[in-house]
Amino acid sequence: AIILLAVYRPNLLKITPNQWKIVIPSGLSLGAMNLIFYLAIERIPIGLAVTLEFIGPLVVAVIGSKRLIDYLWVLLAAIGIVLIAPWSNNGIDLLGVLFALLAGALWAAYIVLGTKVSKIMKGGDAVATGMLFASILIVPFGILENGLTNLTPTFLYLGIALALLSSAIPFTLEMKALAQLPARTFSILMSVEPAAASIFAFIFLQEYLTFNEILAVVFVVIASVGSTIT
């Protein structure tokens, strides 16, 4: 939030009541989504958490669909999600699953609200203001968890890098995308996330892809490309 506010410098005094009514819930849904997702990956594998979370955007895609061809891309994305999820793990933490599904519901809310915000506010202003309210929601939990004991130079450097790579840059780009794309198309394009999570897990964590996981990557890529060209 600090980085985005410094870069875009939104004039909070000029934000209208109608804009506040949308940007505040958008920011809160964003903050809650991130907080609950991290609670999920404390309990279940990242690939499963991302897969379950994507059910939210997938629901948005289905609800916003009006053509038969749209359901084909949603179906392909759904098949990819099912294939990529480690359903064979019998020791899955049910609370972790619940957290991931709740994060998905909040993600769906963020997509819908973000689409509305992008139509009435500049992208940078919307992201910076929304992230401000997201931080207002999340920071108290961090303070209650460990106080200020973790505020070492190394921790702060890593925190800044994480803030840029996981929030500031991605959500700025997402807001620009939401301004140009229907919520349905945006939701299907986001289906690359489960595939990306598995690929990065393979690269950085040496988690090898099975045949089903490779097939899942193919399905979600086809769904993403198909949704943009039809």
What is each stretch, according to the model?
Residues 1-25, 66-71, 89-91, 95, ...:
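Membrane-interface interhelical linkers
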Residues 25-28, 32-36, 78-79, 89-116, ...:
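Glycine-/small-residue-enriched transmembrane alpha-helix faces in small-molecule transporters
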Residues 27, 31-35, 58, 108, ...:
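Hydrophobic/small/kink-forming positions within alpha-helical transmembrane segments
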Residues 38-68, 103, 184-202:
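Specific alpha-helical transmembrane segments that line the substrate/conduction pathway
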Residues 40, 45, 64-67, 117, ...:
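Hydrophobic/aromatic residues within transmembrane alpha-helices
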Residues 49-52, 113-135, 167-203:
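Helix-helix packing/entry segments at the starts of transmembrane helices
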Residues 54-105, 119, 143, 217-230:
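Juxtamembrane helix-loop boundary signature in multi-pass membrane transporters
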Residues 155, 191-230:
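C-terminal-most transmembrane helix of multi-pass membrane proteins
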